[in-house]
Structure formats: structure tokens, C-alpha cells
Regions:
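Hydrophobic "anchor" residues on beta-strands that sit immediately upstream
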Residues: 93-95, 115, 127
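All-alpha amphipathic helical-bundle segments outside canonical DNA-binding/catalytic cores
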Residues: 165-180
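Conserved catalytic-loop position in the HRD/HxD motif
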Residues: 99, 119
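Active-site activation/catalytic loop segments of kinase-like enzymes and analogous catalytic loops
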Residues: 122-163, 180-200
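ATP/Mg2+ or Mg2+-diphosphate-binding catalytic cores
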Residues: 178, 182-226
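Conserved protein kinase catalytic/activation segment
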Residues: 105-116
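ATP-dependent phospho-/nucleotidyl transfer catalytic cores
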Residues: 1-97, 108-110, 209, 214-216, ...
Length: 226
């Protein structure tokens, strides 16, 4: 609930860089039939409906809790959501953890040691930048994300390209914005139908929703969704 610091986000991103570069555009991932992609039939059949189920609740109850323009972003995305999912599947692909929230990250006592990720049950073959959009957009306080998101993205992009991978900055920025829009569906799930269970769960749901929508506004994410 407190959120990650910029230093913690850097450490997590450095670990993700190793994962992403190892599997970047690796065709052997396509042979893993159990490893989903963003447009897997199960996702196409459920995720847009989850998004739309939360929209009336967002409009009725959250307008004064989010940055100005957040509800307009949600409305604009509504008829474009399936097209967004198609674009997310276009690549470049790698092995993505796909659930990079703080609960799934262990930080070492010695900062020189790498962090460890757990809970790979949602891993998929998709753009690596999606892991950054999820981490920054949902696990950092809005002010921290606002101040550091571009530097964190440039850190990841620089290390990716330094490894010999060709990936333009403009594409990276576009793909980050698209991913930030996609993860609004998680907030819609929380406010639309998900039982948070207890006080901590409710606090986490509130933090997730405000952070992810405020981040989408801060980075002009909707500009990535014509």
C-alpha cells in the first residue's frame, strides 16, 4: 500500500531486464502452448467485459477521487479496448512476468544483490515494457511515478538496446502508453465486481485504482489509442 521507491523500482527493473533480454523475440516461446499471449481466446472473451462492467461504477463513484480527465480516458478507451489488445499482441515479444506488483517482489538486505520475483502464474509472451507499466503504474505512489517514470523507462530501454536489441525509443514510449491503458482493466475489475475481502484489500484496491488512472493521465496514455 505504501508503494515502491524509485530505488526499489530501479532494482526490480534491473532484474526484469535480464528476463526480457534473455527471451527477446525468442521463437521457442511460441512452442510453449501453455504460455498465453495478450489476445488468447480466454482473455478476449473476458477482459473487455470486465473493463466495461467497471465503467459505470467509475463514472458514478470515482470522478472526484482521480485526476481530472481520468474518467474521460476510461470512456474514450471503452470502444477501442479490443483494438488495444490486438496492438499489445503485435510485439516485440519476450517472456513477461505480467504481475509485477510489490507483493511479488523480494528485495535483498544487501542492495548489491538482485531482487527476486515470485508468482509466475500469469506469465505470458508479450512486450516486456508491459511489466514496467504495471510496476510503475500500480506499485508507486502517484507523485513518485510522476517524477521518475520516464527515467525508469529510459533505464530499461537503454539496457535493452545496449545488449544489441534494436528497439526504437518512440516505439518503446508508444508501447508503454498502450500498456498503461490496458492495465486500467485491473482497476475496473476491483471496483466493478472483485471482493477485496478485508481492510487491507480495500486499501490496496483504492491505491491500485487511483495510481493506475492518475498515471494514465500523467503520461497522456490515451494519445496512444487513436
Amino acid at each position: 500500500v505504501e508503494g515502491a521507491t524509485a530505488a526499489e523500482a530501479e532494482a526490480a527493473i534491473d532484474a526484469l531486464i535480464e528476463l526480457h533480454t534473455r527471451w527477446w523475440q525468442d521463437e521457442s516461446l511460441a512452442a510453449l502452448t501453455w504460455l498465453p499471449v495478450p489476445i488468447a481466446p480466454a482473455y478476449l472473451a473476458t477482459v473487455p467485459d470486465i473493463y466495461r462492467a467497471g465503467l459505470p461504477v467509475l463514472e458514478a463513484e470515482w470522478g472526484d477521487r482521480l485526476l481530472h480527465g481520468a474518467v474521460d480516458v476510461a470512456r474514450t478507451l471503452d470502444p477501442r479496448f479490443e483494438a488495444l489488445m490486438e496492438r499489445l499482441a503485435a510485439g516485440p515479444t519476450t517472456l513477461s512476468h505480467a504481475d509485477t506488483r510489490l507483493d511479488n517482489i523480494f528485495f535483498p538486505v544487501d542492495p548489491a544483490e538482485p531482487v527476486a520475483f515470485i508468482d509466475f502464474q500469469l506469465c505470458m509472451r508479450q512486450r516486456g515494457v508491459c511489466d514496467l507499466a504495471y510496476l510503475i503504474g500500480t506499485s508507486m505512489q502517484a507523485d513518485e511515478a510522476r517524477e521518475h517514470w520516464e527515467a525508469l523507462l529510459r533505464r530499461w530501454h537503454g539496457r535493452i538496446t545496449d545488449s544489441g536489441i534494436e528497439y526504437g525509443w518512440d516505439d518503446c514510449m508508444l508501447h508503454y502508453r498502450e500498456a498503461a491503458l490496458y492495465y486500467l482493466c485491473g482497476a475496473m475489475s476491483l471496483i466493478g465486481s472483485f471482493d477485496t475481502g478485508n481492510e487491507r484489500g480495500a486499501a490496496m484496491a483504492t491505491a491500485y485504482t487511483t495510481r493506475v488512472f492518475d498515471h494514465a493521465v500523467d503520461i497522456d496514455a490515451i494519445e496512444a489509442c487513436p
